[in-house]
Every structure is written in C-alpha cells, then in structure tokens.
Amino acid sequence: MSFDYFYGQQSDLFTFYRVPKVLFTNERFWNISADAKMLYGILLDRMSLSAKNGWIDKNGRVYIIFTIDEAKMALNCAEQKAIKLLSELEKKAGLIERKRQGLGTVSYTHLRAHETPE
C-alpha cells in the first residue's frame, strides 16, 4: 500500500490531537508514559466538545464523560492498560480527577491545567 502526498490546501483537511509540550519537557511529568500523555491529549480534545455543549459543573468547571471502553478504543489497547493510563494521569501526574456518580454509572472526569510554574 502506498500513500499519496499532500497537495496545496489538503494539509488543512485533517484534525489532530494536541498534546501539550510541557508534558514532555517538564520533569514533573517524566514519570508518566507517552501513552498516558497521548490519552491526556485525547481528553483535552473531548473537553473542548464538552465546553461547547455546556457540560459545566456547579463550580463552573468543564467535565467530560470518558469511559474505559472509550479509552480502549481510542488507543487500541486492552482494558487493563486503559485503566493503568487513566490511573497514571490521575494519581501520578494529577492531571485528571474522576468522580463516580453512583453504582453502575459513568464517572465525570475533570481535567486539570497542565501548566506549571517555571
């Protein structure tokens, strides 16, 4: 299989996940895997959709609903790996906070700002 080249304005036709550079350059985040950093970029993308849809909690914070199955699909990985990556973002890096809404329901996830003082 061969791929054709991009021509002219075609390069603007695709959407991309944006992964904050600070996750790779600041030693505070060196303890989390590249896959977890990629997942954070995917969660940031989902957050912008949630903001557009008005998914704001009572404290004015945007939240997302992103299940383990969605993480598995997004990264093409097994369930245990998806759980591990979300745990890295929450417990190791402090970049997300998951709140369970009740037994058998999905968790609300709040993303935390990734900026750190230099």
Task: Give, region by region, the residue ranges found by the protein language model.
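Winged helix-turn-helix DNA-binding recognition segment
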Residues: R46-Y108
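Extended hydrophobic/Leu-rich segments
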Residues: L13-F14, V106, H110
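Single conserved hydrophobic/aromatic residue that forms the stacking wall/gate
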Residues: H110-A113, P117-E118
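Short recognition helix of helix-turn-helix/winged-helix DNA-binding domains
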Residues: M1-D69
